[in-house]
Amino acid sequence: MLMSTSPSPWLAAAMLCIGLANAHTVIVYPGYRGNNLHTTGTVEGADGLGIAWSSDNETLIYPYGMQWSYPCGGMPTSENRTKWPVQGGAVSFQPGWFQGHSRAQIYINIGLGTVPPNMSHPMITPFEIVGPDNDPYPGTICLPQVRLPAGIEVQVGDNATIQVIELAQHGAALYNCADITFAEPEDVAEVNSTNCFNSSHISFETIFTTSSLENAGLEAVTVPSFLTAVVPTFLGIAYGLLMA
């Protein structure tokens, strides 16, 4: 199976940038579980592990950074939940808080319940972002209308966790989570251009597959119709730009 990308320049945003410091990925909206922008201990001290006990066996160390820890970047479930529309709503995040993210793939999943057993329900078709360079860069991405996965039904007052994954070009996955409580739209704080906008220097590309080449022959490579899967996500981005 061959992986390809198709540029979508019309999706590039034209909004303001904001200044950031060096770190990893941060969820802007809904409110994320907490600050997991920490790197503690050393690779040698952890014997090459991504997570290990400190030498005194009293604390965990994260020599590569907390955000490399599945499912929520080393952060436990939060009691400070954000009300989120019961029919779906906005998800906004900042992807460039670390070196090596000039290109990255974005996944957004949801886990159901106060303490979800897993995050196995994809909310969007994955897409690729293209940043200005491999140095840390400012900027925000917002999907103004992320809907619940097909077949998932929730009620007002139910709890869930939204998981944002940034798959970096060196293969590492960075995890971040936001704990939510479903509410009626009129009971949810307004989402506006202060917390939901798309920065002009971050562009978007689709991710799709082509059929494999059999027996090294030069057979025609067919591209399946992926647009029906990815267009809703990107139309949501474009809609957010128009409404900002």
UniProtKB/Swiss-Prot annotation:
Residues 1-23 form the signal peptide. The keyword Lyase does not apply. GO terms for molecular function: metal ion binding. The modification Methylhistidine is found at H24. Pfam families: BIM1-like_dom. Its cofactor is Cu(2+). A lipid is attached at N215 (GPI-anchor amidated asparagine). Keywords: Cell membrane, Copper, Disulfide bond, Glycoprotein, GPI-anchor, Lipoprotein, Membrane, Metal-binding, Methylation, Signal. Its main location: membrane. Disulfide bonds join C72-C177, C142-C196. CDD domains: LPMO_auxiliary-like. Binds 1 copper ion per subunit. The catalytically essential N-terminal histidine His-24 is post-translationally modified by methylation to prevent protonation of the histidine side chain, and protect the critical active site of the enzyme from oxidative damage. Lytic polysaccharide monooxygenase-like protein that has diverged to biological functions other than polysaccharide degradation since it does not perform oxidative cleavage of polysaccharides. Acts as a cell surface-bound protein that functions in the copper-accumulation pathway. May also act as the major cell wall sensor that regulates MAP kinase-dependent hyphal anastomosis, the fusion of hyphal cells. This is Lytic polysaccharide monooxygenase-like protein ANIA_04702. It comes from Emericella nidulans (strain FGSC A4 / ATCC 38163 / CBS 112.46 / NRRL 194 / M139) (Aspergillus nidulans).
